[in-house]
Amino acid sequence: MANKKIRVTGAEAEQPSILKRISGALTLNPLDYHLDYSKLISLNFMVKISFHDASDYDLFVREGITPVELFEALASNWSTDSGEVHYVDGNTHDKDEIDTSVKLCELITIIKDLPFHKSEESTHFSILSTSLTLGFGDQILQKHDNSVIPIITERSLPQYMHAIIQYEYPRVSGGIAATICAGICIRSPPIGNCPPIMKPLHLELLCYHYGLKMSGDAPSPAEGKIGRIKRPTERKEDTPSMTKRLKGGVGATISRMLSWKE
């Protein structure tokens, strides 16, 4: 994760509008702020936000949403220590330098209400249909809302896998998909005052359970549309990783895998 922050500073003497001040961030070059991931993710712009629990997050918003839609929604919840809205300009300042603070639960609500457009089949890393990716830092030590379950992957997920993930993890539907990391992880509840535990969940397990391939091939015509993908009832002979169908479905098995009881 890049350590460089996008900073916010005080308003100019002319007192430009909130939207103009905030939308100035759109002129930033993503390569300046997220060198590792900007080449992997197709982004229109990036905004870095420091939340109320002092953890740093990168908020990635991909193709489909207009600057006006995003920043008008954020404007009413945009807060600073000084009580006035400041704008993001990407520069380093010696005076009046603060980080923008938005509560995580409020931001989730705002993003869910925005009219996102579906990305094209060729664009990847849009795990949920909202095309929203929230990147968590290397360490998450503060308590968070139990309803927030990040899914993390470094693979280019085929479009049809989005519906499968949402089907298996309904708590993620309309929630947040986290950014690039090794494998898929889901934060294990309950969180409470304890640090969340990230345990690996392999894409291969989901793909096997649905008879799909990791190569990105779409389901065969016999498997029907995305919403009606059927689970295999028998183990494929060329898949030695499992010996029988999982009782209760892959969702129940994964829930047991992610249990806090070892």
Curated annotation (Swiss-Prot):
<keyword id="KW-1043">Host membrane</keyword>
<comment type="subunit">
    <text>Homomultimer. Interacts with nucleoprotein and with the cytoplasmic domain of glycoprotein.</text>
</comment>
<dbReference type="GO" id="GO:0016020">
    <property type="term" value="C:membrane"/>
</dbReference>
<comment type="similarity">
    <text>Belongs to the nucleorhabdovirus type-1 matrix protein family.</text>
</comment>
<keyword id="KW-0261">Viral envelope protein</keyword>
<protein>
    <recommendedName>
        <fullName>Matrix protein</fullName>
    </recommendedName>
</protein>
<keyword id="KW-0472">Membrane</keyword>
<keyword id="KW-0053">Apoptosis</keyword>
<keyword id="KW-0946">Virion</keyword>
<feature type="region of interest" description="Disordered">
    <location>
        <begin position="219"/>
        <end position="243"/>
    </location>
</feature>
<comment type="function">
    <text>Plays a major role in assembly and budding of virion. Completely covers the ribonucleoprotein coil and keep it in condensed bullet-shaped form. Inhibits viral transcription and stimulates replication.</text>
</comment>
<dbReference type="GO" id="GO:0055036">
    <property type="term" value="C:virion membrane"/>
</dbReference>
<dbReference type="GO" id="GO:0019031">
    <property type="term" value="C:viral envelope"/>
</dbReference>
<dbReference type="GO" id="GO:0033645">
    <property type="term" value="C:host cell endomembrane system"/>
</dbReference>
<dbReference type="GO" id="GO:0039660">
    <property type="term" value="F:structural constituent of virion"/>
</dbReference>
<keyword id="KW-0468">Viral matrix protein</keyword>
